[in-house]
Design a protein with these regions (language model features):
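N-terminal pre-domain/capping segments
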Residues: 1-109, 180, 215, 263, ...
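Histidine-acidic metal/acid-base catalytic patches
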Residues: 1-5, 13-29, 63, 111, ...
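Active-site beta-loop-alpha junctions enriched in small/polar residues
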Residues: 7-11, 36-38, 74-77, 120-122, ...
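Short beta-strand segments at enzyme active-site cores
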Residues: 32-33, 69-74, 112-119, 153-156, ...
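Short, solvent-exposed loop/turn segments at secondary-structure boundaries
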Residues: 43-47, 84-91, 126-131, 195, ...
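Catalytic-core regions built around general acid/base machinery
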Residues: 52-64, 138-146, 197-200, 231-235
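Active-site acidic/histidine proton-transfer and metal-coordination neighborhood
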Residues: 61-64, 78-180, 190, 263-265
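A general structural signal for short secondary-structure boundary/capping elements
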Residues: 76-80, 116-117, 142, 230-232, ...
């Protein structure tokens, strides 16, 4: 029932082909592609500059590593506030749409049926309601474009976004009918919300990011983890979830996310999740 993938951006200090081969070596058949401006592996800027040749090389690299893409995660700015989906500038939003369409083309070309984006942020120059309206408009447009291509679009609620609490995420879901989530418990638990509250978002999840997390810590080792993955898995099983559990440790100098041994923690967390899944299966 449960399928696992691993993010390429878990191993940013390796060059792309080596990172993909490591993902395969760790026992994964699927990889989450991070199409980030800051990425050392997949760049929306390079994609836009030469879409055909860039896509052909990505396909070749995936084939060489014997991997399939489980998600394409597009981030257009260096950080979430730069060139956000709901940027107040219509010119920037138009340029964002151009990048997004290229990302969608890549998603289709690599035979991936799931694409993740960020919801947007609040801007000091805008009224909060206007930011929410613009975010909803852009999200609805992205969903429509993806649906026409046979791809599921979702947003990832995250620290610093318009959806940084469970309630604000639920409110945004009410604004955009049919929207799904790429759900990472860590962003909520870091801010002090309980796993029990985050469980309420499971019915809207089409993709799950998993890594250790705790209050005030976006990323931790498995040993230090405070996220209720057992409850999460039980909820997903009850819902008949058929998406991916993506192991998504990152290595970046942000919120202490460069203090874990990503190879070891990826292996340990997958083993822990598989053990919990076996117990759930035996109990049913």
């Amino acid at each position: 029932m449960f399928k696992f993938s691993c993010a390429d951006f878990t191993f940013p200090v390796l060059e792309r082909t080596a990172a993909l081969k490591l993902v395969k070596l760790l026992g994964f058949d699927h990889v989450d592609i991070g199409l980030f401006v800051r990425s050392t592996h997949f760049s929306p800027i390079d994609l836009q500059a030469a879409p055909q040749s860039y896509t052909a090389q990505v396909l070749q690299d995936l084939d060489d590593a014997e991997l399939r893409a489980s998600d394409v995660f597009v981030q257009i700015g260096v950080d979430p506030s730069e060139r956000a989906a709901n940027d107040p500038s219509s010119d920037i939003r138009i340029k964002n749409r151009e990048v997004f369409l290229r990302a969608l083309e890549l998603c289709v070309a690599v035979r991936c049926n799931h694409l993740t984006g960020l919801p947007g942020v609040f801007h000091s120059t805008n009224a909060r309601e206007r930011d929410l309206e613009t975010a909803a408009e852009e999200t609805a447009w992205r969903m429509k474009e993806c649906a026409c291509a046979g791809v599921q679009y979702s947003i990832e609620p995250h620290v610093g976004s318009i959806c940084e609490e469970v309630e604000s995420a639920r409110a945004f879901l009410r604004r955009v009918e049919g929207l799904t989530l790429t759900l990472d418990y860590g962003h909520f638990v870091m801010a002090g919300e309980s796993s029990a509250l985050v469980h309420d978002l499971l019915p809207f999840a089409s993709h799950i990011h998993v890594r250790g997390g705790a209050p005030d810590r976006l990323q931790t080792s498995v040993e230090e983890n405070a996220i209720d993955f057992t409850g999460m898995l039980a909820g997903l099983k009850q819902l008949g979830f058929d998406g991916f559990l993506a192991l998504e440790y990152v290595w970046v100098d942000w919120n202490g996310c460069n203090r874990t041994d990503n190879v070891s923690e990826t292996v340990l967390l997958r083993r822990a999740l598989e053990s919990q899944i076996r117990r759930l299966t035996e109990a049913s």
